[in-house]
Regions:
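Non-catalytic accessory segments flanking enzyme active sites
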Residues: 13-85, 268, 277-293
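Glycine-rich "HGGG/HGxG" loop immediately N-terminal to the catalytic nucleophile
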Residues: 57-59, 105, 125-139, 173, ...
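Short beta-strand element of the alpha/beta-hydrolase
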Residues: 90-99
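The serine-hydrolase catalytic nucleophile loop
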Residues: 100-112
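Conserved hydrolase catalytic core segment
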Residues: 113-117, 157-210
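Conserved alpha/beta-hydrolase
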Residues: 114-130
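Conserved acidic catalytic loop of the alpha/beta-hydrolase fold
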Residues: 142-161
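C-terminal subdomain of alpha/beta-hydrolase-fold enzymes, centered on the catalytic histidine
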Residues: 228-360
Length: 360
């Protein structure tokens, strides 16, 4: 059964958030530390005070409620999703999947341009936001992809495309693997490339530089990834009890992974962080890093790739072509890891170009 859903956070939860923010116990900071030890204290205090006294959750809640929200139970888990129908009845449907530390609202600014040509289904990953928390182990890429296939079946879509970045990329390519007869193609804006000494391919200087960046990242695994992959429950206690802890944990990702030429606004970032806080899904969302250790199966359907210059890493096409049926490859001029929020017009145009060309 599919049920309409409306976001309506109890006022008591908002009052509790403001009270906790007002009573934050701050650590000291080394003079002139900058980013050497992590998120700078002055900037975090600024964000926390704005979250408490300036940011208006109700205004953003109303904006989110302008979209048609629904919930349904799949494989024992409540699944939240947005479903926007195009004015074109025979339009192709696209299922758009966010990543961590994002949420369904990543796609807020691509809904209008994409819905001109496509029906849109935008789910929250199990364990995230209004699809959370999860209550059992095993929600990995394959299980989520199978849930997406069932969701699209329930909505009556026999053939559809998939799109995503971060975890949304892995979920989308996995959906192409588990339902290749249904998925016409997959578009991603994040496709990790790993060094492969056995690959007999010619690499450009740009390719080599991108692989060097990957090697450095692999040698110095990001702390957030190590913690959430190993002990998401442990870090979850701190993030679920301290809004400033949750703020720092996610705001650091936005600061480091976005293009300085196209920053995400504080309001949009705080709405994303508020979704994690108000649904108490820090731990359950982090479990996805733990449960996806086995990676994604091969994806046999056509793939489109959009590469953004300020993403965590950039894809290497000769290596990607050994693994995927690449039909479309774009090197965009601006944007980072949160492309749908940073440069929605560029991402929407690239998604449209890939799928409309594929359908010709």
């Amino acid at each position: 059964m599919i049920k309409p859903f409306r976001i309506d956070i109890p006022q008591a939860d908002l009052d509790d958030l403001n009270d906790r923010l007002a009573r934050t116990r701050w650590p000291n900071e080394v003079a002139d530390a900058g980013w050497d030890y992590g998120f700078p204290l002055a900037r975090l205090k600024e964000l926390a005070e704005y979250w408490r006294a300036g940011y208006d959750w109700r205004a953003h809640e109303a904006e989110l409620n302008e979209l048609p929200h629904f919930t349904t139970e799949i494989d024992g888990q409540n699944i939240h999703f947005v479903h926007v129908r195009s004015s074109k009845p025979d339009a192709l449907a696209l299922i758009l999947t966010h990543g961590w530390p994002g949420s369904f609202l990543e796609f807020l600014d691509v809904v209008e341009p994409l819905s001109q040509d496509f029906h849109l289904v935008i789910p929250s990953i199990p364990g995230y936001g209004f699809s959370g928390p999860t209550h059992e182990r095993g929600w990995d890429l394959v299980r989520i992809a199978r849930a997406w296939a069932e969701l699209m079946r329930r909505l009556g879509y026999e053939r559809y495309g998939a799109q995503g970045g971060d975890f949304g990329s892995g979920i989308s390519t996995t959906l192409g693997a588990v339902a290749p007869e249904r998925v016409v193609g997959v578009h991603v804006n994040y496709l990790p490339s790993r060094p492969d000494p056995d690959a007999d391919v010619e690499l450009s200087e740009t390719d080599e530089a991108r692989l060097d960046k990957v090697r450095r990242l692999m040698a110095n695994r990001p702390p957030y990834q190590a913690l959430q992959a190993a002990t998401p429950q442990t870090i979850g206690y701190a993030l679920t009890d301290s809004p400033v802890g949750q703020l720092a944990w996610i705001a650091e990702r936005f600061a480091q992974w976005t293009d300085p030429r196209s920053p995400v606004s504080d309001d949009r970032m705080l709405t994303d962080i508020s979704l994690y806080w108000l649904t108490a899904t820090a731990a359950s969302s982090g479990r996805l890093h733990h449960d996806t250790s086995r990676g994604a199966p091969p994806c046999p359907v056509p793939l489109g790739v959009a590469v953004f210059p300020h993403d965590i890493t950039q894809s290497v096409r000769p290596l990607a072509e050994r693994l995927y049926d690449i039909r479309h490859w774009s090197e965009l001029e601006r944007g980072g890891h949160f492309a749908a929020m940073e440069v929605p017009e560029l991402l929407a145009a690239d998604i449209r170009d890939f799928f409309l060309t594929l359908l010709k």
